[in-house]
Amino acid sequence: MSITGATAATTGLTVPSAATLNTNTFASATYTPSGPVKYDGVNNITISGLSITAGSGPAISISNAINVHITLCRLVNGTNVDAVGIYLFKCTNVTIDFCYINNVSTGVYASTSTGVYVASNQMLNMRGPAPRGQFVQFNNCYGPGNKILGNRFENVMGQSNPEDAINIYRSNGVSGNPIMIQANWIRGGGPSKSGGGIALGDDGGTYQTASDNVLINPGQYGIAIASGTQMSIVNNQIYGAQAWYTNVGIFAWNQYESSAGCSIITISNNQVNFTAAGGYQNSSWNGGNCGTINGWNNNRWGTPDVNPTVLPSTMITAQ
């Protein structure tokens, strides 16, 4: 483990292309065995090259820290709901990249933090149970620089117990620098009747964008706007085959009318092919309580061009 000045700053990074982010093979990664890592109030550190078994708690836990880089780590095998891969609390400027995370309750759980940059990781089989079960969840995160970019996420039915693949809860980006979920590959979800692909605006929030993601059989839904202001779903590809728990490909529906508004919504240039449990095409739904949805007629609902072959048969190459 290297405890040095952080080698990557979170803010000011340009967004790499999807092709660049998704060609990482992890083939040359080597790891040093370690017990769980926990730091509170330690700034300017790099945690690199560790193999950690999570056990009953987080594999890596960081709180009250500034400028942290977690890279090329292997974090596996949690035994309960507390065993997340990486837990962040009240942190600023954290980069998590090129990590392999497998069989934990949640991959990355960031709470009350800002500038959290999660990029080019591979994660397999989130075990939950709820309220965990995400590859990445932002809870009350805020400000610029919060990004989830170019990761590969896969849940295998019977080996996982996921909720949302990505969940953005009560979190706020800023104008010109939204919380960005871009160019991720997501495959597998269910059988949760509440979980699915990417949830924006979970109990409010502002300035969140999901773009250029590919989701194959992500669960009950593909991408959702559950409330919030300045929310965007653009240029995504979503496929869902009929299963007993499937519902809808993309929806906008304020599920929190008593506590959060829902307005200034864009859903545009998406390609969706999603079959509900009843066997009918159900690629989109407008719940009618988020105002006018910009771009709604510019999507390709029910297109056969989106199918399971848009992602490679072997997606997770790390071990």
What are these regions (language model features)?
Residues S227:
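Short, well-ordered beta-to-alpha junction loops that form the rim of enzyme active sites
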Residues T4, S48, N167:
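Residue-level detector of conserved, well-ordered beta-strand and adjacent loop positions
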Residues L13-H69:
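N-terminal segments that cap or nucleate solenoid repeat domains
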Residues N43-A54, I66-N77, T92-N103, T114-G128, ...:
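Right-handed parallel beta-helix
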Residues I3, T11-G35, G249-Q319:
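Acidic, glycine- and Ser/Thr-rich low-complexity intrinsically disordered tracts
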Residues T30-P36, A54-S61, T79-L88, N102-A110, ...:
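Extracellular beta-strand/beta-solenoid scaffold signature
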